[in-house]
């Protein structure tokens, strides 16, 4: 019996590693930052890459520093975006070894997949424009005719290249015939990856710089650039809040994802989807991937998700005072510096019981 339990445990671990394989690369922040990325052998030595991604790594070594940067940005942006929620994305720091909140097809994993997918393409697209990559350059000049008073110029983000390379990297584990995991899980992961990239594409906007005597802006040079990651993450957060729970069922001659509650319609390409309902994240429960909200900072005057009532799940909160030092009474002196005094201020903080 002990041997059987051991084998079952190993199978579950293997299955979990495949289920969340497409975001294991977020673990590259642990050891990828110390790699010079000048030898293909580095690719197989790193935690966080499944075999298909290791092959892509070997063929595209010059991209890997951008991939590491994307992993850092995705983890940081996720935690900033959810800092006011019970689930605050802190578990993403465990990459490449995830807890159930990110390994079981939850609403939270849907967000992280989408954000990671958008971030890697965003980072590569901007690396092209900044001249960091030898294999790409500025984005193509838009085909649309420029409007009155501006011309196309500058160096736009290379979204086309970013999407191609980013999708190849994050989608590889689900498209491999050798990968484990259920067909339903592969489908929702690919779907949520695509949602992330679509939000990224929708963020492409025209950016301009003025030219003219004394800043008159008689002529503007414009290019296509992506909005910053916090904007993209907030768009995805809105989709997270309205995500659709789905089931995998036979529809005609093939199996499809359909909304569990509204299975009369297909899943929309623009919505995040998930398979497993999440806990309320109020109490610590490692089996569910919940860290709980004890000792979390809350906002006494807020009526949102960071309010002490919601954040603390009705358990109440403790108050304490803290003295902070900040700049004050600043004066500008010609030319050209600012001098400030240092002032102390006492603030009241609140933490959940």
From Swiss-Prot:
Residues found modified as Sulfotyrosine: 274, 281
Superkingdom of the organism of origin: Eukaryota
Entry protein name: Protein Wnt-11b-2
Quaternary structure annotation from Swiss-Prot or TrEMBL: Homodimer. Secreted homodimers form a complex with wnt5a homodimers; tyrosine sulfation of both wnt11 and wnt5a by tpst1 is required for this interaction. Interacts with the transmembrane receptor fzd7/fz7. Interacts with lrp6 and ryk. Interacts with tdgf1/frl1. Interacts weakly with frzb1 and strongly with frzb2/crescent. Interaction with frzb2/crescent antagonizes wnt11 function in the neuroectoderm, but enhances it in mesodermal tissue.
One Gene Ontology CC term in the entry: extracellular region
Pfam family, one: wnt
Keyword Lipid metabolism on entry: no
Lipoprotein listed as a keyword: yes
Major localization class: secreted
UniProt keywords, alphabetically: Developmental protein, Disulfide bond, Extracellular matrix, Gastrulation, Glycoprotein, Lipoprotein, Secreted, Signal, Sulfation, Wnt signaling pathway
Role summary: Ligand for the frizzled7 transmembrane receptor. Primarily acts via non-canonical Wnt pathways mediated by either Ca(2+) and PKC, or by JNK and dvl2/dsh. Depending on the cellular context, can also signal via the canonical Wnt pathway mediated by beta-catenin and dvl2/dsh. May also inhibit canonical Wnt signaling. Maternally initiates dorsal/ventral axis formation by a canonical route, which signals via lrp6. In a complex with wnt5a, activates the canonical and non-canonical processes involved in axis formation.
Organism of derivation: Xenopus tropicalis (Western clawed frog)
Signal peptide: 1-22
Glycosylated residue positions: 31, 38, 88, 299
């Amino acid at each position: 019996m002990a041997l059987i339990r051991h084998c079952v445990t190993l199978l579950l671990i293997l299955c979990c590693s495949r289920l969340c394989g497409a975001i294991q690369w977020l673990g590259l922040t642990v050891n990828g930052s110390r790699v010079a990325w000048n030898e293909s052998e580095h690719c197989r030595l790193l935690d966080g890459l499944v075999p298909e991604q290791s092959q892509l790594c070997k063929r595209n070594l010059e991209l890997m520093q951008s991939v590491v940067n994307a992993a850092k940005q995705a983890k940081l942006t996720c935690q900033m975006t959810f800092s006011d929620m019970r689930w605050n994305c802190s578990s993403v720091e465990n990459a490449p070894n995830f807890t159930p909140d990110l390994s079981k097809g939850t609403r939270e994993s849907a967000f992280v997949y989408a954000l990671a997918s958008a971030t890697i393409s965003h980072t590569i697209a901007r690396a092209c424009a900044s001249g960091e990559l030898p294999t790409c350059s500025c984005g193509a000049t838009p085909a649309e005719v420029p409007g009155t008073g501006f011309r196309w110029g500058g160096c736009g983000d290379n979204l086309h290249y970013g999407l191609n390379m980013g999708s190849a990297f994050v989608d590889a584990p689900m498209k491999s015939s050798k990968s484990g995991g259920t067909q339903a899980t592969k489908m929702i992961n690919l779907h949520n990856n695509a949602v992330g990239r679509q939000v990224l594409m929708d963020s492409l906007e025209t950016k301009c710089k003025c030219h003219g005597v004394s800043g008159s802006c008689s002529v503007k040079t414009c290019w296509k650039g992506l909005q910053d990651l916090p904007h993209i993450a907030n768009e995805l957060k809105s989709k997270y809040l309205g995500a659709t729970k789905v089931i995998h069922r036979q529809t005609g001659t093939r199996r499809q994802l359909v909304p569990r509650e509204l299975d009369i319609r297909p899943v929309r390409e623009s919505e995040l989807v998930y398979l497993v309902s999440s806990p309320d994240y109020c109490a610590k429960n490692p089996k569910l991937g919940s860290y709980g909200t004890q000792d979390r900072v809350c906002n006494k005057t807020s009526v949102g998700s960071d309010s002490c009532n919601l954040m603390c799940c009705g358990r109440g909160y403790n108050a304490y005072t803290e003295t902070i030092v900040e700049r004050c009474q600043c004066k500008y002196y010609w030319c050209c510096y600012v001098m400030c005094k240092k002032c102390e201020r006492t603030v009241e903080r609140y933490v959940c019981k």
